[in-house]
């Protein structure tokens, strides 16, 4: 199963190929996507993305995980989350969201099992 491309991105809105849903923040993996609801894990801009935020995507068997920190990079990614991913053997890319989407789509079109978590506002 391939990773769906992100079809569009604008402030507060993301569309994923194969889905009719418009996401504010989303998780994407080979074969699917869904809302990234920060309330599920108590996530806030700081301390930021926690292992619990990426665990679902990791469990889908991704080789690379792309994290979009927001348009202004307000969302933090603590070293503990990066270490968690590295210990799982996953290459992690942490970028501003527009750059993260470009990176994710480039990897997806190459057929790489890539996943992502993306924050589409600040």
Swiss-Prot record:
Gene that produces this protein: AAMDC
One Pfam family named in its UniProt record: DUF498
Source organism of this protein record: Bos taurus
GO terms of biological process kind: positive regulation of fat cell differentiation
Localization terms from the record: Cytoplasm
CC terms in the record's Gene Ontology section: cytoplasm
Keyword set includes Cytoplasm: yes
Keyword match Magnesium: no
Listed InterPro entries: AAMDC (IPR034096), MTH938-like_sf (IPR036748), NDUFAF3/AAMDC (IPR007523)
Main localization, broad class: cytoplasm
Source organism superkingdom: Eukaryota
Keywords per UniProt: Cytoplasm
CDD domains noted in UniProt: Mth938 (cd05126)
Entry-linked SUPFAM superfamilies: MTH938-like
Name the record gives this protein: Mth938 domain-containing protein
Segments for region (MTH138-like domain): 6-122
Its job: May play a role in preadipocyte differentiation and adipogenesis.
Entry's family note: Belongs to the AAMDC family.
């Amino acid at each position: 199963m391939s990773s769906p491309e992100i079809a569009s991105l604008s402030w507060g809105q993301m569309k994923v190929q194969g889905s009719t849903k418009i996401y504010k923040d989303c998780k994407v993996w080979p074969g699917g996507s869904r809302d990234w609801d920060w309330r599920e894990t108590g996530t806030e801009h700081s301390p930021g993305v926690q292992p619990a935020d990426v665990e679902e995507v990791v469990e889908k068997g991704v080789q690379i995980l792309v994290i979009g920190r927001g348009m202004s990079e307000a969302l933090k990614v603590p070293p503990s989350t990066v270490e968690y991913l590295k210990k799982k053997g996953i290459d992690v890319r942490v970028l501003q969201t527009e750059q993260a989407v470009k990176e994710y789509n480039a990897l997806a079109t190459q057929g790489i099992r890539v996943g992502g978590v993306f924050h589409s506002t600040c």
